[in-house]
């Protein structure tokens, strides 16, 4: 009976090692071609490796938690293809595994909780991956239903809706989580939202300060005085990338406060537009489109520095910084410059779901040209982000909240955010950085410019 060895393949771009996270089979199990055998963690992502062999698992040569070099035998398969007269040299088997890993589509009935994609908040439930069904459609004002008078500053809140009394409660996932953290029963809350939904203010009003301290428990201090965490995998890759960027590229940062009221109105209208039914729409979508628009006007910020030359990219692979339980990752939307607003929304949604499931592949994070980090979902006003290696621009989107703002000589409450950009000063001069961020701000202030 023929025994075939499976060698750990290079599933990324020049990766040299990976950690065995979990085995999906045991010795004696029957396996088919393309059946997932093992889950590994590289310096870039978590990857499921399918078997290029058919047969019976002979021996698992590496234990979970062990880090091994590319090309190391990690398990054996007996029989199968050999019995059918099909043999495969080790090198071809390795390449087959890489090809199979790249072609496998991962689906899950429900995304794993816990992973937070910057710009989308906590992972939801009952969300399935979908493809955009109208790839060619672009957002047009005519496609929108008549907009409700948008929340004009000073407008009185909607008529309060009494507690549901056991009926369904309208509340967004972050509001439900806040209510759970504060020990507030949503069915007892009087809703003041525009369509009868429970708002953050409603929950905070219901939960008194005393209940906050009573229901949010502080973890006990561990018995051990110290904890030592081995630096490996994604954390090691993050550390190396941040050190390389911080100490090789001289960062320059600029900031601007922006009236985002019309962006909030535009997002509300998009959610009601027929073409966008079932599509995730948030201010991050407008921000992403604004970045692409501003790059076209200021192409230098979409460059890379090579010591010998500056390479200006005339395409946009738009990175979205994502915080996950495994650490920071920056997948990117390929060729974002050619996407309509609807297509970009679908691409961001796909990127979100993939990151939540921990299935972002190395290729999804390669060849980025400029990045957005949405620290606003964590309640932060702004920051000085570090450049993604190989890029010369990154923009932080701060939280969007109501603040006093002067409009036509009068102080009114408006939705305001702060944009913070970091740039590689070897490539981007201060005037270019300022013009670029001002262009981004102009779209946030008036997103209708995107439709010109």
From Swiss-Prot:
- Function text: The pyruvate dehydrogenase complex catalyzes the overall conversion of pyruvate to acetyl-CoA and CO(2). It contains multiple copies of three enzymatic components: pyruvate dehydrogenase (E1), dihydrolipoamide acetyltransferase (E2) and lipoamide dehydrogenase (E3).
Q: Does the keyword Ubl conjugation apply?
A: no
* UniProt source species: Leifsonia xyli subsp. xyli (strain CTCB07)
Q: Which domain of life is it from?
A: Bacteria
Q: Which cofactor does it need?
A: (R)-lipoate
Task: Describe how the cofactor binds.
Answer: Binds 1 lipoyl cofactor covalently.
The entry's family comment says:
Belongs to the 2-oxoacid dehydrogenase family.
Q: How does it assemble?
A: Forms a 24-polypeptide structural core with octahedral symmetry.
Which catalytic reaction applies to this protein?
N(6)-[(R)-dihydrolipoyl]-L-lysyl-[protein] + acetyl-CoA = N(6)-[(R)-S(8)-acetyldihydrolipoyl]-L-lysyl-[protein] + CoA
The protein here is known as Dihydrolipoyllysine-residue acetyltransferase component of pyruvate dehydrogenase complex
**Which class of enzymes does this protein belong to?**
transferase
Which GO molecular function annotations are given, in alphabetical order?
A: dihydrolipoyllysine-residue acetyltransferase activity; lipoic acid binding
């Amino acid at each position: 009976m023929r025994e075939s060895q499976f060698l750990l393949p290079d599933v990324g771009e020049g990766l040299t090692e990976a950690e065995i996270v979990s085995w999906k089979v045991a010795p004696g199990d029957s396996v088919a071609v393309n059946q997932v055998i093992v889950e590994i963690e590289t310096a870039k992502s978590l990857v499921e490796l399918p078997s290029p062999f058919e047969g019976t698992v002979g021996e698992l040569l590496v234990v979970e938690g062990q880090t091994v070099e590319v090309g190391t035998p990690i398990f054996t398969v007996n029989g199968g293809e050999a019995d059918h007269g099909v043999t495969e040299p080790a090198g071809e088997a390795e390449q087959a595994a890489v090809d199979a890993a790249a072609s496998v589509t991962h689906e899950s009935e429900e995304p794993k909780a816990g992973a937070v994609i910057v710009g989308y908040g906590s992972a939801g439930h009952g969300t399935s991956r979908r493809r955009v069904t109208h790839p060619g459609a672009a957002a047009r004002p005519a496609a929108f239903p008549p907009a409700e008078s948008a929340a004009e500053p000073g407008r009185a809140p909607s008529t309060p809706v009494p507690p549901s009394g056991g009926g369904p409660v309208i509340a967004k996932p972050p509001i439900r989580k806040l209510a759970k953290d504060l020990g507030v029963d949503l069915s007892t809350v009087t809703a003041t939202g525009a369509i009868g939904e429970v708002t953050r203010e409603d929950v905070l009003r219901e939960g008194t300060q005393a209940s906050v301290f009573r229901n949010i428990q502080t973890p006990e201090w561990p018995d051990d005085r110290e904890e030592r965490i081995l630096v490996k995998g994604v954390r090691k890759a993050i550390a190396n990338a941040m050190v390389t960027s911080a100490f090789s590229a001289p960062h320059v940062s600029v900031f601007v406060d922006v009236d985002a009221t019309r962006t909030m109105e535009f997002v509300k209208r998009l959610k009601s537009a027929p073409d966008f039914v079932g599509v995730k729409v948030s201010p991050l979508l407008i921000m992403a489109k604004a970045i692409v628009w501003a790059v076209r006007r200021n192409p230098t910020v979409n460059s890379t520095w090579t010591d010998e030359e500056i390479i200006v990219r005339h395409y946009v692979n738009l990175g979205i910084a994502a915080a996950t339980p495994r650490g920071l990752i920056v997948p990117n939307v390929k060729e974002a410059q050619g996407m309509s607003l609807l297509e970009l929304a679908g691409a961001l949604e796909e990127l979100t779901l993939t990151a939540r499931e921990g299935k972002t592949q190395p290729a999804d994070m390669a060849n980025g040209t400029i990045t957005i980090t949405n620290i606003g979902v964590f309640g932060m006003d702004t920051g000085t982000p570090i450049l993604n290696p190989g890029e010369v621009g990154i923009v932080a989107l701060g939280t969007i909240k109501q603040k006093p703002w002067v409009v036509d000589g009068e102080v009114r409450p408006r939705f305001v955010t702060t944009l913070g950009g970091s740039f590689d000063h070897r490539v981007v001069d201060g005037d270019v950085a300022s013009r670029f961020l001002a262009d981004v701000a102009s779209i946030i202030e008036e997103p209708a410019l995107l439709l010109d």
